[in-house]
A protein has these predicted regions:
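Bacterial N-terminal signal peptides that target proteins for export
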Residues: 1-11
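Short, aromatic-enriched amphipathic alpha-helices that serve as compact interaction elements
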Residues: 29-49
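Short, solvent-exposed secondary-structure junction/capping segments
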Residues: 45-72
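Hydrophobic/aromatic beta-strand elements that line small-molecule binding cavities or substrate pockets
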Residues: 123-130
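Surface-exposed, charged secondary-structure patches
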Residues: 27-29, 62-120
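C-terminal segment of classical bacterial N-terminal signal peptides
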Residues: 15-23
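Low-complexity, intrinsically disordered terminal/linker segments enriched in charged
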Residues: 104-109, 117-122, 139-161
Length: 161
C-alpha cells in the first residue's frame, strides 16, 4: 500500500475551517418579559462586564439607539451609564419584580423592577411590546434614583433639565 503525504491537505482543510463564516449568534427571543429582566439582573449581580444583548429592542427603540450612535460621532454619546442599574457602575441587590398588564392590550406588558445599586434605591419600569419575534423592550423609565429619566427621551434629546 502506498501512502501519500496528506499533511498539506490536512493543513489546508484546517485553515479553510478557521476562515469559514461562523454561524451568527442566535437571536434573543423573549418569551416572558419578567423572566428576561430577572435573567439580566442575575447576570449583572455577578459583577463583571456583562452587557445585555442589543437585539432586544422594538424597531422604535432600536432606531433611537442607532440615532444616538450616529450623532455621537464615535464619542460616548447621550447614554453614559448602564440604564439597567441607573448608574455607570454598581451591582444590583434586593431585586423585586412586578408585572403590570396593560388594559385591553395583551401585546403590551410593563415590568417594574425595584432594587438597590449600592445604597441608592432604584425603581425602573420596563415597557415591552409583543411582535412576531416575541417580546421586545420598547422603553424604560426611571422612577427614583438621582434624577428620573425616560430612555427614549435621552436617546433622542439628551438629558433634559
Amino acid at each position: 500500500m502506498k501512502f501519500q503525504n496528506t499533511s498539506g491537505a490536512v493543513a489546508l482543510a484546517l485553515l479553510s475551517l478557521a476562515f469559514a463564516p461562523q454561524p451568527a449568534a442566535a437571536a434573543t427571543v423573549i418569551t416572558d418579559p419578567a423572566a428576561f429582566v430577572q435573567s439580566v439582573y442575575a447576570r449583572l449581580a455577578k459583577g463583571g462586564d456583562y452587557i445585555p444583548p442589543e437585539d432586544i429592542y422594538t424597531p422604535h427603540l432600536a432606531a433611537l439607539w442607532a440615532l444616538e450612535g450616529r450623532e455621537a460621532h464615535g464619542e460616548v454619546g447621550r447614554i453614559d451609564f448602564l440604564f439597567w442599574i441607573d448608574g455607570q457602575d454598581g451591582t444590583p441587590t434586593d431585586l423585586r419584580l412586578r408585572t403590570v398588564p396593560v388594559e385591553g392590550r395583551l401585546d403590551r406588558r410593563i415590568v417594574v423592577a425595584t432594587f438597590k445599586n449600592g445604597e441608592q434605591a432604584e425603581a425602573l419600569k420596563f415597557y415591552f411590546q409583543k411582535g412576531v419575534s416575541g417580546w421586545k423592550l420598547d422603553d424604560v423609565v426611571s422612577l427614583k434614583g438621582q434624577a428620573p429619566w425616560t430612555l427614549s427621551v435621552i436617546l433622542k434629546y439628551g438629558w433634559v433639565d
